[in-house]
Amino acid sequence: MATWSNLGLQDSASPLMEQLNFFHDHTLLILIMITILVGYLMLMLFFNKFTNRFLLHGQTIEIIWTILPAIVLMFIALPSLRILYLLDEINSPAITLKTIGHQWYWSYEYSDFMNLEFDSYMVPTNELETNGFRLLDVDNRIVLPMNTQIRILVTAADVIHSWTVPALGVKVDGTPGRLNQTNFLMNRPGLFFGQCSEICGANHSFMPIVLESSPTNYFIKWITAMNSN
């Protein structure tokens, strides 16, 4: 989900997404090198006018094209395994947010606070304000503190959904009867948008996610106001 004038990935808002960006660039560089090498060899063979009538086998080249791809795969697999481990590791979360997917809206529960839960629906186009984002704005945003370890629990009430915020590098499937979890830490304030990433019915495209990252003191004020209401 690109933003204005953005042809690549979104700017990262969490250390995990930053690691994913680095891994993307690392892997893309390897793929470009492979493409150039294979293209060069194909062109050389295509325009080569020499023939070897006595070639029976090429044991040396067979060993090379077996070992070389294995080494290249190691350079891709090891960073990938490291990031997969980091994505699953949860270190002493300060706040737990429970997310429930419905057809076609999200419900949120702040498990660490008393009676703090709400539903989040997409704002229809005819009710959207001038500075709103079409098909991305919601009536109730999630508000979470920045520079804080957050754990998110995701499930669903009807069919399979997927809670996804690209700027944070978070994508968790919500499956009825199961509770999936992941963690993230937002390192800058701002609004981060996401959408359901699992086809879940007719209005699958109309259940966006809006997460507001704010300093801790503003988050405490928001929590106090929500509890008083």
From Swiss-Prot:
Topological relation to the membrane, as annotated: Multi-pass membrane protein
GO annotation terms (biological process): ATP synthesis coupled electron transport
Residues that bind Mg(2+): E198
Transmembrane segments: 27-48, 63-82
Bound cofactor: record note: Binds a dinuclear copper A center per subunit.
EC number per UniProt: 7.1.1.9
Catalytic activity: 4 Fe(II)-[cytochrome c] + O2 + 8 H(+)(in) = 4 Fe(III)-[cytochrome c] + 2 H2O + 4 H(+)(out)
CDD domains per the UniProt record, alphabetical: CcO_II_C (cd13912)
Residues holding Cu cation A2: C196, E198, C200, H204
A Pfam family per the record: COX2_TM
Keywords in alphabetical order: Copper, Electron transport, Magnesium, Membrane, Metal-binding, Mitochondrion, Mitochondrion inner membrane, Respiratory chain, Translocase, Transmembrane, Transmembrane helix, Transport
The keyword Protein transport belongs to this UniProt entry's keyword annotation: no
Positions annotated to bind Cu cation A1: H161, C196, C200, M207
UniProt topological domain (Mitochondrial matrix) ranges: 49-62
Domain of life: Eukaryota
Molecular function per GO: copper ion binding; cytochrome-c oxidase activity
Family designation: Belongs to the cytochrome c oxidase subunit 2 family.
Assembly: Component of the cytochrome c oxidase (complex IV, CIV), a multisubunit enzyme composed of a catalytic core of 3 subunits and several supernumerary subunits. The complex exists as a monomer or a dimer and forms supercomplexes (SCs) in the inner mitochondrial membrane with ubiquinol-cytochrome c oxidoreductase (cytochrome b-c1 complex, complex III, CIII).
Function per UniProt: Component of the cytochrome c oxidase, the last enzyme in the mitochondrial electron transport chain which drives oxidative phosphorylation. The respiratory chain contains 3 multisubunit complexes succinate dehydrogenase (complex II, CII), ubiquinol-cytochrome c oxidoreductase (cytochrome b-c1 complex, complex III, CIII) and cytochrome c oxidase (complex IV, CIV), that cooperate to transfer electrons derived from NADH and succinate to molecular oxygen, creating an electrochemical gradient over the inner membrane that drives transmembrane transport and the ATP synthase.
Protein name stated in the entry: Cytochrome c oxidase subunit 2
Biological source species: Simulium vittatum
Gene that encodes it: COII
